[in-house]
Amino acid sequence: MALPLDAEASDQAIKEVKALAKITLTHKQYQCHNEIVYRESRWDLRAVGNIGGKKQAYGLYQMKLESLKTADHMRQYWKYWYYVVHRYGTTSHNDADYCKALHHLKTKGWQ
């Protein structure tokens, strides 16, 4: 699937990401997840960051994967989930540890 083309479809995609996160994460991890997305992209599926850097970052989570440039919202969600699990581990509830990822963002002073 590709990115939604209009504002209404983008709004629906964001609602779907939030709903998926809400049913798969604890409340605390859900809050951390949402703060990460807000900090990284302001919930913009088409966000492009690191413009002056060697590699641009794309999507909700600002990942430096060219394949995410046109990836739909669910692909972006699961790619980042996989990244967080492998980089920061899981919680006792087997959630991706978004709070550790958020802590890392804050300690590095990013966003």
Give short role names for the model-derived ranges.
Residues 3-43:
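Export/targeting segments at the very N-terminus of extracytoplasmic proteins
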